[in-house]
Structures are given as C-alpha cells and as structure tokens.
C-alpha cells in the first residue's frame, strides 16, 4: 500500500494531504472546525485514512497553482491545529476562500492516488470491470443528499466536472441561499471545495440536496454521500460488480461474514386490541425445507452468494395479520431484505385496521432493533430502488439510532389499491387485489371496509412506526408514479421492495470495519 501525498496552494494558503485506503485516520486541521468535521466523514463512511493540514505561507511561493508533485514549501509556514479556528480573536477572516480551494485540491489529488492504486490492483486481478461509477444517498434526520460519482469518465470533457446543488442551506434564514455561516464555515464556499476536489480527482461529480431544512444536516449529508459513493465506486473497480444505490434488478446483498452471535429476536404482545407474535432472523433466508416446521431453522453459517441466497428465499407468506395488503407489503419487504420474518396477529379488525397495522409495525420494529444489537461492523446505511408495475420508489436508510421517517409518496386514495369508497363492488382498482375480495364479488360494505383493507394513512403509519421503533432514519422518495386509479398499491409494493433492499445492505457485516461502528463520533446515539 503506497501513500497518497499531495500539496496544493491558493493565495497564502498551503494544504498538504495524505490518504490511505482502508486504514485508520490521522489528523485533519484546515483552520475551520466545521470543515475538519466534514472531511472526517471520508474516514467514517469512505473507509479511507485522511491526513490533511492547512497553513499560511509567510513568503508566498513563486508558483501558486496546485500540483500533487510539488514538495512542501521552503518558506516559513504556520500550520493550523486540528479543530481550532485559524482566525480566533480576529475580526477579519482573510483566508477562508483559499482554505476551501487548497484543501479541496490537495484532498482530491490524494484521493486520485488511491483510485490509481485500486485500479492497478484490479487490472492485475483481471476483474471484469463494472466501471468506476456509483450513486449513493445518505440521510441525516430530515435531510438527505445524493452523490453521483464517476471516477473514470469515458467522456474526457467530463473529467473534473462538478455540479453542486445544495442550496438553500437551511430554511431558517432570510434569502434564497439560506444560512451564511455554520460556526465559522462559510456556506457560500461549499461549491469551491467540491469543484477543487473534483478537478484534482479527475472525476465527474454531482451533489444534490434532495431534502433538508437544517443547514448542518444538508452539508453533512452531502459529505457522507460523497464518501459512500467514493467507496462504492472503488469497490466497483476492485471486484467488477455494482455497488452503491441498488437498482430493482440488483437482487439481495449476500452476507459477507458470519455474525459473532445470532441476530434474532422474538416478541409477543397481548392487549385488549391485539395479540401479536413476531420473530425475525437477520441471517437465515427463508428455506423451503423450513415450511413443515412452521418456523426458521438456525443459520448454518454458510456464506451464500447473492444468486444462491435469492434462489433460497421462500416466497410463501409467513405473515398473517388479517389485512391482505399489509401481509403483501411485509412479505415483500422481508423477501427484498433476505431476512426471515414471521408475523401473526389477531386484532380487533371489526373496528378497523388501525390497531392491527400499528401494533404489528411497532412490534416488528422493536424486534428488528433488538436483533441488530450494537450495530458494530455493519455497513449501517443502505440505498435501494424498488418497482412494481409503473411505480418506482427509492429508500434511503440509516441504522443510526436517530429515529426519523419521511416520505413523499402520493397516497391520495382512501385505501391502498383505490377501493371504492362506497363499497358498492368491494373491488379496488386493479382487479380486487387490495381487499382480498374476488373481482366482481359484491360483499356488504362492512365486510370490505372493517379491517380487511389497509387505509393509505395506515400504510404511512406502518412505515413510520417500523422505522422509529427500529431506531433508524428512512426516506422514501417516489421516482415514478403512474397516478392512475389503484396506483397506491403499486407505490406500496415498490416502497416495500426498496425498503427491504436498502435494509439488506445496511445490516450487512463489512469485515473491513473490524467490528467498529460506522460513525465519526465513534458510537451511535443511544
């Protein structure tokens, strides 16, 4: 493993960077504390060790253009301490702009050396190249950003191309750009950093704010998304397979290593409203051989390829809530996640669907949280798309212990699948698939509406309760919506597939993390 050293200059500022692949970090000191914190996300989420320091060159060098081949300046230089503002006690901040440019340039050049190292190793191993491009989205509470990165653009005109669309930086400030400062970090200089980094990296990068009203969250989400996209693009180069945000055709994420202990949980809950039993096993695919037992067998520890794992997933339902659409949604979620999920519920559906749907989601989320344990060594984040019919949904998931759920799905029908409100036919749009009633059959309205169908408000509540009780953050984003009668069923099943696929990637144990938690804090919130 070779070091990746670079030096860059802008005005009176010099930046020196070293990046090592898959090693612990050293120190980051740009002179702007929030920028230090953001660059540290590359270590936690990109799995690269970053050392970067900036300083003031008291006698400007003869040449001020950046170059990773330049030696450190001979002129006296005052370097900034990590996590300490360079202008403390001063009214002027003369070097802010140059710090963003020099730090971005030096870091980009250092990252380029890592790319060249991985590309060289991939060429030696003759891995069938999938390219060096990836998309990733990282959420942070109400915010999430999208990073689209290509480390080796085929079109030479796109080398160094950078598009940054993160404004407004928060919604609690006047003007169209949002907040001007985060600590002593000037938000207006954010594009300068990314443009300088991308130019030195020779990549093609688009950073886009999808959601977010908190400036800190928006910018941190962007840095995390880039870090994850960078790691995913490196992995594409290394093993010749796709990484990053999973497409609907990507299939399951195969387990990489055996967990230290079984990741299982079981809960039973009985109230005047519902009686529920839930069991989950994160590491045991649904095997056909288990069917006579009525439950899952213990995982043998065999590491399965994605193809073999997908072939072993049992497609028969083990979810019985009494609400047909809810059964379909949870079954699809479990299938896409590649986990074993057993749910049984007897509820007061003679009232409506509320108590059964809510209590199932709460209990399932609690089981998932318990099975995940301390989350040490997990990938932690997952991004995936799902589709059903003409609907396409993206799920962005973080097992962060920071509960938050957000969705823009257009759930504009009273019942999932568009059941006729008057119950005259009992048939939802699309042939009766939503209610469990055969097409053309005309039961009394009460038979249809009282608890046998899932209302759209409870579909939202199911995803919300599951996410919060799992102590995770999840965003659902509608990428395509037919909008035709009954479209809410297509959205529901596409969302379930996306959620499950994102979950399968988030719960995957990454041996490169050596049992550590993927967080710049070193731990997750309790």
Locate each region found by the language model:
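Structural preference for solvent-exposed beta-strand-turn elements
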Residues: 2-64, 68-70, 74-526
